[in-house]
């Protein structure tokens, strides 16, 4: 499964200003963003990236399903598996955008993928993405557990009103996962990216806090410790 983060502007400057503002006569409080937490589920742990995660990544070749999820822009810019992975892990451990959270997905003591949440502190919304690079572990409900953990933290701890994502229209496994977690189909970006076999559509999906509160699956809340790395 794979979904991707949209590009929100950094909110670092916004957090240095007033903690509230007015939109069309409505007073809103800017979200306060804590440090990256450790989120623990029944089978997976979401944590900060560690140097040894690069070895876990390199044990598993990039397969077509994973590559499709990254999109055509990633394929154009990719310059070697180790370079890309090390660059990604460095960015994840020391993000330039302080409104972006990136977790390594740990299962059975090894990193098997990553999940991300990019937050708009003014609009109380975030864009979510997840990818598992171990093909044999897809389809076992791990992506659903990761998604539920991040949604629980986003709504219950951050105080988000909305979480959104986009996914390749042909990725039926990922779409089923998101639907099971309460996300709703909101639209289509038609022929949004060019792939080797033609233009591809992307499905837009979203989950609102009231929908989550009345029926979306919940996972155990994260512990209060800081990010950990192996």
Give the predicted meaning of each segment.
Residues 156-166:
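Conserved GNAT acetyl-CoA-binding A-motif
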Residues 49, 103, 153-155, 183:
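Conserved hydrophobic/aromatic "anchor" residues
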Residues 134-136, 140, 169-170:
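Active-site acidic-Proline motif in GNAT/NAT acetyltransferases
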Residues 143, 147, 170-174, 191-196:
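Short glycine/proline-centered loop/turn elements that form peptide/ligand docking sites
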Residues 45, 56, 127, 145, ...:
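Amphipathic alpha-helical recognition patches that constitute DNA-binding helices
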Residues 49, 164-167, 179, 184-200:
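Conserved catalytic-core motifs of GNAT/GCN5-like acyltransferases
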Residues 139-153, 175-180:
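Conserved acetyl-CoA-binding loop-helix of GNAT-fold acetyltransferases
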Residues 4-8, 16-136, 199-200, 204-230:
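GNAT-family acyltransferases
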């Amino acid at each position: 499964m794979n979904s991707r983060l949209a590009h929100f502007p950094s909110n670092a400057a916004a957090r240095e200003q007033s903690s509230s503002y007015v939109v069309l006569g409505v007073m809103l409080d800017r979200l306060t963003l804590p440090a990256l937490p450790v989120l623990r589920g029944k089978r997976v742990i979401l944590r900060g990236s560690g140097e040894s995660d690069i070895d876990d990544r390199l044990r598993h070749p990039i397969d077509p399903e994973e590559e499709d999820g990254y999109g055509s822009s990633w394929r154009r810019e990719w310059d070697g598996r180790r370079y890309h992975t090390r660059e990604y892990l460095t960015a994840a451990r020391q993000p330039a955008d302080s409104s972006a959270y990136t977790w390594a997905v740990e299962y059975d003591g090894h990193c098997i993928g990553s999940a991300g949440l990019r937050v708009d502190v003014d609009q109380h919304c975030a864009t979510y993405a997840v990818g598992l690079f171990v093909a044999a572990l897809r389809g076992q409900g791990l992506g659903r557990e990761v998604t539920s953990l991040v949604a629980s933290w986003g709504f219950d701890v951050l105080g988000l009103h909305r979480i959104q994502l986009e996914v390749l229209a042909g990725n039926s496994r990922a779409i089923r996962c998101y639907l099971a977690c309460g996300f709703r189909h909101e639209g289509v970006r038609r022929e949004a990216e060019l792939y080797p076999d033609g233009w591809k559509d992307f499905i837009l999906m979203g989950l609102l806090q009231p929908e989550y509160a009345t029926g979306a699956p919940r996972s155990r809340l994260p512990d209060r410790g800081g990010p950990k790395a192996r």
